Amino acid sequence: MANRDKMQKPDWMNDEEWAWFKERTSSLDLIRSDAKADVQAYLANPAGRAAGTNAQGGFPTLLLTTVGRKSGEKRTTPAVFMRHGKDLVIVGSLAGYDEHPAWVLNLNAHPKCEVQLDFDKYHAVSRDATDAERKALWPSLVKTFPAWGYFQMQTERPFAVK
């Protein structure tokens, strides 16, 4: 994304939401800091997070723990997700910045991961959605979290769908 100052307010946001949204996505450092705080808030009170009843913005949220591709250390991040059958689908948007989120790169290197839904923890193996799956899933993903559609318009980088 060349210039975040030129972002236009989406029709589905009011002015107050837009001001908050634009400020909270204004830098990668702020996004990363917020993610760390969100992990702590999730761990302190996980009930309802997976349903979006106890999460920022009311979106279904999980905790994803990956193995760092460089460090080999466990890294945990919150992720909005969508259920698709038995699968949990997440999107590597990083608020429309031109780089992939670290968790995408980590999963590309080490697909085995851990997922926490509310109090429940699971072992999982990540995979990329095929182009056909991504195309079929995208409208439902954007319905789940409209910002993904907005962010995708801000960059030429195709978002990872896992």
Name each model feature, range by range:
Residues K162:
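Catalytic adenosine-cofactor/nucleotide-binding cores of aminoacyl-tRNA synthetases and other
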Residues M1-N54:
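Extreme N-terminal tail/first-helix region
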Residues N54-G57, Q152-E156:
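Short coil/turn segments at secondary-structure boundaries
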